[in-house]
Every structure is written in structure tokens, then in C-alpha cells.
């Protein structure tokens, strides 16, 4: 486990989570989740959905004292299938748990992050390393980000910035839809500055990006309270890391 930016993270491959086991879905999914899982036509969609729930509930039961006493199938994680800016909601016995959760996956692995710190929301994103064309870069990156990318091609890729933007949006949004260019990541030697719809988030937003084999992982946390966290050094980090499932 790595504790980073006021949150706990878990990473695992689908193989490690044994999502193909006949009993896994029944053991880990609530009735509502099981109904939704059975409606998915794609095997990949079923496997990634199940993997995300398994890993998220492992993290939740380790962090939240109420959830620790519950069976995994008693916990329901509700999210918006259209990805239109609705955070996952965690329900137990009809009550919503006070916990900020974020789930992201590729076809092969899943990353989850969570925190029970009051006033802190977070977002995680997991992206496969691959070449992305000029059209994608134009639609996702601002001119400043593209210029930085050209100057730092050995250390940074479009996939890194993609993952960071997704993570920031998940942490910061208030229900609006995702617009990639509304999030601007300014990476400088003295630290990272994040703008959201032109607003400088300053020290309220903490951001980290690193590599996990052939994937890019990013986590962002956002302080929503009036009181700001203590000053910190928000330096960019692109490095390998190991997270336990």
C-alpha cells in the first residue's frame, strides 16, 4: 500500500483478483451490483466492473470501521454509467457512508483510491501507455501543455497528461461534464500548478503521476474545506511504484 496525498491507493491486475472465479461475483457484489453485472454483454466490461468492486471494497473495509464489519455483498457502490460527473456513492443498509472513492481501470488492471478525511475528495486514473495521435492531442491538451510536452518528450507523454487531467476532474468537479481542456496542468521545476476552468487551484489540489509497467497512474486530491492544508512541495513525480492488492 502507498499512502499518498491524504489517501490510500490499491492496484491489482484482473488476474490477481480472480474475476473469472464462478463465486467471485456472488461473494463480492451486492444484489443491485449483481443485477447490473449480469446485464453487461461484454466479458471485458463484466470483468473490469467486478475487479473494481472487489478492490474498492477491500480498501473500504480496511479504512472504514463501519464497512469493516460488513460482508462485501452488503456494500453497494453506485456510480453513473454515463460518466457525466457523478462520484461513486457507497451504501450500507440503506445509509450512505462518508467516504470519497475513485475507481479506474484498463482492460488488464484496476486502480482505486479512497479517503475518509472530511472535506477531501479525490480522483484516480489508469491509462495504458500508447501512442496517441495529433488529433487526440489537439482535443485534450492546451497550447501550453503541448509546448511543455514537446520540450520534455523524454520524461512526459500525452498519456501522462491524460491521466492527470482525468484524476483532477474526478477530484474537483461539482457535477458538470468532463471537458479535457478545462483542466490545465502546468508542470514546472518548482512544482505543479493546476487550473480548472481558468481557476488556479493552488495548494488545494495535490497531484501525482507515476508508471506501473505499461500503464500510467495518477491521483489527485482536493481540499474542499475553507481551511487550507499545510504548504507542501507538489513536485512532479514520474516513477515506478508498487501497490499491494
Sequence positions of predicted segments:
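Core catalytic alpha/beta fold that binds nucleotide/phospho-ligands
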Residues: 1-245
